[in-house]
Amino acid sequence: MEDKLDRYYTNVLSNAEKDKHTTVDSDDKSSGEENLDELLNELDRELDEDHEFLSAYRSERLQQISDHLKQVKKNVEDDGYGRLQCIDNEADAIQICTKTTMVVIHFELETFGKCQYMNEKLENLAKRYLTTRFIKVNVQTCPFLVNKLNIKVLPFVVGYKNGLEKVRYVGFSKLGNDPNGFDIRRLEQSLAHSGVIEDTFEIRKHSSVNTERFASTNHDRSESDSDLDI
């Protein structure tokens, strides 16, 4: 199932990029709808063969998959999803963080090596989690947020859900013992536990990550979630 969904995500992103440079006619749109229907039919057959799924539960899950994929397609077509987007000014960054359901924002300096490293990881996740916006903003362009969030160490990453801060990363300290890097799976799992990225169908599970540790860390923060208080 994971491979099928990943192929669909890749196809949607690829088609969206082509659409920016060409006029989309009705036949192309119909083809996209047929591809979605074909994928859903394949998943239906696959789930039907999986004895772990009870029939009623299988139908519910299939509907969830359908809704999720349609939302993914809409997000990509509306732009802003599927990539790490550079935001040029503070006002736009604030609006995105307060108005978007799920967003991960990286406060960075492009000349700082660790920020470049973080950008690579976030770019990777942005292509896989198409219901979350991933953005980056230069700290020199957002003095209000730098002061508000008390940003003193870079990279500085914050995850918001419905305008509420769910998780933050100051440097790499929460992502392992290596001060110069981290396993992307740690960041992925931590964001998932915080509710900032969603893997609705639990198709990506990494047993190498200590999930209880992340759950405990994010539970502590959830008790004191804060918004931007603009």
Curated annotation (Swiss-Prot):
Keyword Transit peptide in annotation: no
InterPro entries to which the protein is assigned, alphabetical: Phosducin_thioredoxin-like_dom, Thioredoxin-like_sf
Modified residues (N-acetylmethionine): M1
Superkingdom per UniProt: Eukaryota
Stretches assigned to coiled coil: 25-79
Record's miscellaneous remark: Present with 2250 molecules/cell in log phase SD medium.
Subunit structure: Interacts with the G protein beta-gamma subunit complex (STE4-STE18 complex).
Protein family (similarity comment): Belongs to the phosducin family.
Name of the protein described by the UniProt record: Phosducin-like protein 1
Protein's organism: Saccharomyces cerevisiae (strain ATCC 204508 / S288c) (Baker's yeast)
